[in-house]
Amino acid sequence: MAPEQREGKSQVSVTFEDVAVLFTRDEWKKLVPSQRSLYREVMLENYSNLASLGFPFTKPKMISVLQQGEEPWKSEKESHGCSPLGCHGSLQTTKSTQTKESLFQELKRKQLKRDEAWDFTSGKSCRPDNSFRTQDTNESLEIISINHTKILTIDKSRKNFKFGPSVGLKSIGKQKIAGEKTQRNSLEENSTLLSQPKLKTVEKRYKCSTCEKAFIHNSSLRKHLKNHTGERLFQCKDCLKAFSQSSALIQHQRTHTGEKPYICKECGKAFSHSASLCKHLRTHTLEKSYTCKECGKSFSRRSGLFLHQKIHARENPHKYNPGRKASTSLSGCQRIHSRKKTYLCNECGNTFKSSSSLRYHQRIHTGEKPFKCSECGRAFSQSASLIQHERIHTGEKPYRCSECGKGFTSISRLNRHRIIHTGEKFYNCNECGKALSSHSTLIIHERIHTGEKPCKCKVCGKAFRQSSALIQHQRMHTGERPYKCNECGKTFRCNSSLSNHQRTHTGEKPYRCQECGMSFGQSAALIQHRRIHTGEKPFKCNTCGKSFRQSSSLIAHQRIHTGEKPYECSACGKLFSQRSSLTNHYRIHIEEDALNIDLHE
């Protein structure tokens, strides 16, 4: 052996403990068999490689145990923190299991190699004075360093080394050892440890007694409980809107200031919420698997493709009819694999991307409604629905139409209202060809042709085409009138009736016909009026085939075939099939009463 090699080895004393990774009995129990096998393989190879360098040290007891195929802690008794290596000095450590497990993931990659030069100092510049030189000075060698942060002291016979919790065999990189060489600091490599997957799952110990949602931290549970109690301590000074969390208030204030602190590094687009930025970043990283058949443009989300297709619908409305589903270039099976949904509902088989979405959905089957209104006692399955409902009592309408100034309690209602001004209609009924502005409206409209009425009243058995009509009907049985006019105090069963009534005080007529300029106080009146210009008569009698512009006209006409006469005169008891006929009949009694008064006088 060359003198410079012997001199190099005399400068630094290396023992097996320097490169061994130790586990306590409890930590060893948490390793799965594949991890234990990998640990055994790496430790034996490290010992073999270290022994081949010719350093003088005794064979550790743990190596003998591993070579016999036994587990380190199988026959050992844990006593005062001793490791399976045997108590070669005092070992004190506060290193968490999670750190060791993170280290374990890179143990295989960072095992020792034969004929490698070593430096166990603190990461400073290494000047070996021509030591560690092999016969071929041009040979590339890989310098290995042990890097540490927190204190873990191992007392040795020759030296005291101070290490830390991120104990790891750090591969610094291949360098040419010739003359004067330096060692790079391995701190820059620590990010590889942090990026390793965590083996240990964190227990969610804090559980909500109302909805059973679990949280890791008690503070998160306290914030969540405010959704049930309705507590709102943080108020906006601009619009007086209150929030249960300070973070929600900060985000809300950005709607007033226009601040957008979250900027995309890819395209420079700015966002007011971090969640919006995260959602936007997917457009740069996700595979664009939804392709428009018209122009070939691709999108990462089906909703993006659907909105894009509306552009083609405006250009060629007769050719394009999106129908109920947006078309994509992928088959149904491929779409399932490209966007996995791992949470399955056992009741109906629907799948969801998150456990919270599954919990919300399951309340449909269980009927659970944990969020209750403190004003009227009405309960909801989601906190967002409760917040929107509370605006009925407070009168708050934060979403305002820029065209006519009308306010709404939710953004979805505002979007539906805007269609009145734009006239956009992208959904065509296959039966009558009627164009509708939303998919949900198309589904409800189609029930007119099919006669389907899935929403049934449990009290009287009456059925309705939509759930909102059922809710309004049920208030007839309960007597509930939650909508009150602030001008005259009159109450109503539905919000639309209140809105229509309030226009009698203001004289407002926001619905304007683009054909003749005539204005109306109600959207239904405008819709009926438009049929005069278009000649549309969508309501057809199944008995005689006669068509009508209004559903009320069809109902009145059908009484001719059925013979039903629901309107009775309170004076003489005569029956009529239409209200207008009863009104005309009343005039006979009024004229008779006036004649009798004149005769008596």
Swiss-Prot record:
Any Gene Ontology CC annotation: nucleus
UniProt subcellular location: Nucleus
Cross-link (Glycyl lysine isopeptide (Lys-Gly) (interchain with G-Cter in SUMO2)): K150
Residue stretches spanning the membrane: none
SUPFAM superfamilies attached to this UniProt entry: beta-beta-alpha zinc fingers, KRAB domain (Kruppel-associated box)
Single GO biological process annotation from the record: negative regulation of transcription by RNA polymerase II
Domain of life: Eukaryota
Residue spans, zinc finger C2H2-type: 206-228, 234-256, 262-284, 290-312, 343-365, 371-393, 399-421, 427-449, 455-477, 483-505, 511-533, 539-561, 567-589
Tissue specificity annotation: Expressed in brain and kidney. Lower levels in lung, muscle, heart, testis, tongue and eye.
Pfam families documented for this protein: KRAB (PF01352), zf-C2H2 (PF00096)
Domain KRAB: start-end pairs: 14-85
InterPro entries noted in UniProt: KRAB (IPR001909), KRAB_dom_sf (IPR036051), Znf_C2H2_sf (IPR036236), Znf_C2H2_type (IPR013087)
Keywords (A to Z) from UniProt: DNA-binding, Isopeptide bond, Metal-binding, Nucleus, Repeat, Transcription, Transcription regulation, Ubl conjugation, Zinc, Zinc-finger
GO MF annotation: an example: transcription corepressor activity
Metal-binding as UniProt keyword: yes
Family matches, as CDD domains: KRAB_A-box (cd07765)
Principal location listed in the UniProt entry: nucleus
Similarity comment text for this entry: Belongs to the krueppel C2H2-type zinc-finger protein family.
Protein function: Transcriptional repressor that binds DNA upon activation by RAS proteins signal transduction to initiate transcriptional silencing through the recruitment of additional DNA-binding proteins, multisubunit complexes and chromatin-modifying activities to establish a platform for DNMT1 recruitment.
Protein name, entry field: Zinc finger protein 354B
Taxonomic source organism: Mus musculus (Mouse)
